[in-house]
């Protein structure tokens, strides 16, 4: 970690902050000396002692509700570090699905939610010297993931959003990083098999990459390995996905 982290003395807002990666970011920001952390949560009643002894102020926030997002921006005028972490994964396929609205819900949270927050807080960040935006994305958005129906396209859209935001906000001095996350030990990924990373480690890797001035950063071993494997031979990867999908249909009937 650089001698002085960009998180030190910062005023941060983290969406989806009461569990998983979001909670990991809250803890890591506090450890790096953040002055204040706004914890954006959909239901403040869902908060118990997660933030005990941390410099946290809970903010009611649903990233799909533009009125709430604007209220958060108005009520948090000192933010200079925004962590867009809130996410939704429904575990449905994109085309052959029994829930045709699942993909729309995933796009609303994982793409439009990030866009809503970025639009609302861009003026706040600009007024506070430029600041930083960290978008918590997924390896499923770095290449097509057929097992993650609407989630994969939504995260891919958010990856492009990150790049465009970086260009648009460059003049006001806002730095933007896209964090490519693999498999993490969270409630949202409870169904995923295999090795999973600790959410705090993801936050630590993400903030370290922000300190280094990176634009896009893999936060864990799975993200690094999967992206490299796809880059080596995307056709072979896609054929492998087709075989796995066929096996899944035979095993589950879906």
Predicted regions and their residues:
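Conserved glycine-rich cofactor-binding loop
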Residues: 18-19
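The beta1-alpha1 cofactor-binding region of Rossmann-like NAD(H)/NADP(H)-dependent oxidoreductases
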Residues: 60-71, 100
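Residue(s) in the substrate-gating loop at a strand-loop-helix junction
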Residues: 138
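Active-site helix of classical SDR
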Residues: 118, 154
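C-terminal helical subdomain
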Residues: 178-179, 186, 190-232
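Active-site loop-to-helix junction immediately N-terminal to the catalytic Tyr of the SDR YXXXK motif
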Residues: 144-152, 164
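Conserved mid-core segment of classical short-chain dehydrogenase/reductases
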Residues: 89-104, 147-150
């Amino acid at each position: 970690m650089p001698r002085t982290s960009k998180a030190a003395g910062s005023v941060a807002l983290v969406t989806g902050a009461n569990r998983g990666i979001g909670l990991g970011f809250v803890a890591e920001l506090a450890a790096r000396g953040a002055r204040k952390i706004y914890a954006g949560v959909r239901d403040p009643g869902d908060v118990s002692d997660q933030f005990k002894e941390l410099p946290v102020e809970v903010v009611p926030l649903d990233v799909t509700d533009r009125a709430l997002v604007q209220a958060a921006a108005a009520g948090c005028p000192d933010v200079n570090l925004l962590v867009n972490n809130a996410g939704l994964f429904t575990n449905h396929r994109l085309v052959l699905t029994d829930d045709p609205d699942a993909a729309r819900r995933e796009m609303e949270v994982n793409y439009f939610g990030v866009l809503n927050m970025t639009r609302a807080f861009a003026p706040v960040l600009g007024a506070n010297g430029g600041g930083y935006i960290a978008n918590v994305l997924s390896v499923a958005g770095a290449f097509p993931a057929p097992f993650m129906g609407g989630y994969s396209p939504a995260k891919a859209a958010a990856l492009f959003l990150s790049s465009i935001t970086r260009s648009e906000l460059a003049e006001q001095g806002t730095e933007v990083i896209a964090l490519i996350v693999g498999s993490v030990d969270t409630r949202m990924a409870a169904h995923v098999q295999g090795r999973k990373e600790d959410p705090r480690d993801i936050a630590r890797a993400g903030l370290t990459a922000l300190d280094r001035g990176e634009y896009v950063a893999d936060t864990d071993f799975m993200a690094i390995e999967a992206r490299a494997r796809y880059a080596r031979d995307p056709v072979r990867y896609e054929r492998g996905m087709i075989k796995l999908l066929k096996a899944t249909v035979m095993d589950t009937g879906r």
